[in-house]
Amino acid sequence: MKYVVMVSHGEFAPGLHSAVRMMTGNREDVLSTSLKEDMSADQFAENFAELVKDFTADDQVILLADILSGSPFTNALNVLSDKGLISNTLIIAGMNMPLAITAVLMKDNFDDLAALKEVLLSEG
């Protein structure tokens, strides 16, 4: 399966996920989590690991993050790397609504994540 996973500080990723859901419907291949004010980076990493626990080596991940090199971004990458999924992951920081909707609606039209990346970067 090809997943879109959104991560952020605060409620940005869950809020964006909610808005995307209004446009694309509720989908099991779109997930989100966030680093909340009262949460440590380690707690975020644990939550992210739980979110992606069923991902397999055959899965592909489109990781959308709010900020390049922020705690959600780096911890998500560490978890995906530990699971052996980093080579199957397209990573984009600076997520926004057009980018997220395009990722969800177009991801299954591309076998190659590099080709999808070109489309997504034109939206973001």
Where would I find each of the regions flagged by the language model?
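N-terminal loops that bind phosphate or other acidic moieties
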Residues: 1-124
